[in-house]
Amino acid sequence: EVPEAIMEDKIKAFYIMGEDTLQTEPDINAVKKAFEKVELLIVQDIFMTQTAAEADILLPATSCAEHEGVYSAADRGFQRFYKAVEPTGDVKDDWVIISELATAMGYPMHYNNTKEIWDELRSLCPIYKGATYEKMEGLGYIQWPCTDEGPEDQGTTYLYKGQIFDRPNGKAEFFACDWEPPMEDLSEEFPLVLSTVREVGHYSCRSMTGNCRALAALADEPGFVQMNDQDAKELGIKNNDLVWIASSRGKVISRADVSTRTNKGACYMTYQWWIGKCNELT
């Protein structure tokens, strides 16, 4: 929604933190136009990503090995992580950057460490209150709800203990989503469905793992377009051929990975590569 809001003059400035928007978002060409129009683009990151290269102001931050904090997970768990190495260069922790910006803009934020920030968060969220830094010391792991700061409350392993759900009758509610038709239909010009996926050896947009020599060595060539062998035969495409992949939004070049594994009528591309960026098509 942000690119549309920028084009409609509803957003004048955009602050991006730890995200390579020009790599991960659909319809990258529309995002590029929005970034060219926005009056101020600020990017806070640890690497010079494609988005960072377009920033008016670049705020260099520390990596996870250069600062401490708390990780949260999908299993409701909290775990502390610790600084492993001292940062080099003109970089600052994310919380330091945000605090200094807020203070400069008239909203004072004065913290001395991450514990003070975490304690403030706990004070505002009752189900986190008992997840203290002391309980998470070392390899400590706390799952919310954890409402008591005392040592006897070590969190909640099972959220709905006794199969009692947070509803008046104590039972879970199942419901189906309404079906929505596809935004675009197949056509004679575009007969295949493209799905964007992730490279097995890389995480998210590859800005971190792509800077790891060991992982980069596993896949040092830009990604492939995976397609069904029957579709490839009908199009005269052989395995490892360089091919153009086109949609109504643009076209990119990549190498064909032909196999029986891919469903007929479908093709797949990883969105993490700078060359052959499939999100120029989506």
Question: Where in the sequence are the language-model features?
Answer:
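Non-catalytic, well-ordered alpha-helical segments in soluble enzyme domains
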Residues: 94-112
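Short catalytic/ligand-gating loop segments at beta-alpha or beta-beta junctions
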Residues: 112-118
